[in-house]
Regions:
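Soluble catalytic regions of membrane-associated enzymes that act on cell-envelope
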Residues: 226-286
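Membrane-embedded alpha-helical bundles of multi-pass enzymes
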Residues: 2-231, 265-269, 273, 283
Length: 286
């Protein structure tokens, strides 16, 4: 960790955890600043390692980090309350805070189980902010275990009570065509685990940690390139399929008005006709 940033982590861990959470959504579409994924998760994992002997503190750090990324990543939920704002606007603050607060319990649980499992093994780091590298459970092994626990927590968030799979770690790589292709074998949760393993390697402070993290990125890039090249050859051998996507972009305040129904239908047909002038369209998606 860079010196000033490390000092902030030591002096104000809770604020840093929250700020790190704010960084992560900026790695996803549409902003796509991938290094912020590594800075955000790298800082969170660093904090988890440094405070792994204090379960209550770990729980709070995990919750703040999760709340930060979900609060910023779910800002769009508030837009729904601006439709008929005179009725629903008062609910907006509750929606944009309570939902992230509840979902952040999954990340808090991941951090808590991380600390509890290290304590159970009798290998939690000392209270020193510089854990010795000679511990039975190395920093690298602990951080890799945290990557697994975080992935399990994200899977739980994506499935329990119908799930809410938003801003999963796999979406950081999945937003880049030449990193996303392992998803065809591993799924989005497996892709996220790979991304988090690369974070763990980079934060591990082992001799080849950074090299290992970059090598994992490079492997995903090569696999994606080979996959896309293969798919391109297969697609080139098949007849082309023309797909037209129509988005009428209706005003939400008018979308369900019975008096506007015919106008909406006619607009959709006009757009479909205009889009299909260049040739025959096989599929129309609205």
């Amino acid at each position: 960790m860079i010196g000033p940033w490390r000092n902030l982590c030591q002096q104000h861990p809770y604020w840093v955890a929250l700020l790190s959470g704010f960084l992560v959504p900026l790695a996803y579409a549409p902003v796509l600043i991938l290094p912020l994924f590594y800075l955000g998760f790298g800082t969170a994992f660093y904090l988890a390692w440094q405070h792994s002997e204090h379960l209550g503190r770990l729980f709070r750090l995990g919750w703040l980090f999760g709340f930060g990324q979900l609060f910023l990543g779910l800002y769009w939920i508030g837009e729904a309350f601006l439709v008929e704002a005179e009725i629903f606007l008062w609910l907006l603050p509750f929606a944009v805070t309570l939902l992230p607060a509840g979902l952040a319990m999954f990340s808090a649980l991941a951090f808590f189980v991380f600390g509890a499992s290290l304590a159970w093994l009798g290998r939690a780091p000392s209270r020193s902010l510089s854990p010795p590298s000679s511990k039975p459970l190395s920093r690298l092994a602990a951080l890799l275990w945290l990557a697994v626990l975080w992935s399990l927590a994200e899977y739980g968030r994506a499935t329990i009570l119908t799930g809410f799979p938003w801003n999963l770690p796999g979406m950081a790589w999945g937003s880049w065509l030449y990193l996303a292709q392992p998803v065809n074998v591993l799924g989005v949760h497996g892709l996220g685990l790979l991304a988090l393993i690369s974070v763990s390697l980079m934060v591990s402070k082992t001799r080849y940690g950074w090299h290992g993290g970059l090598a994992l990125l490079a492997a995903a890039f090569v696999y994606s390139g080979v996959t896309l090249h293969t798919l391109g050859q297969v697609a080139g051998a098949q007849p082309s399929l023309q797909i037209l996507v129509v988005q009428p972009h209706l005003d939400q305040r008018e979308k369900w008005l019975p008096s506007k129904r015919q106008d909406h239908i006619e607009k959709t047909f006009r757009l479909t006709q205009a889009g299909g002038l260049a040739g025959f369209v096989d599929v129309v998606a609205e």
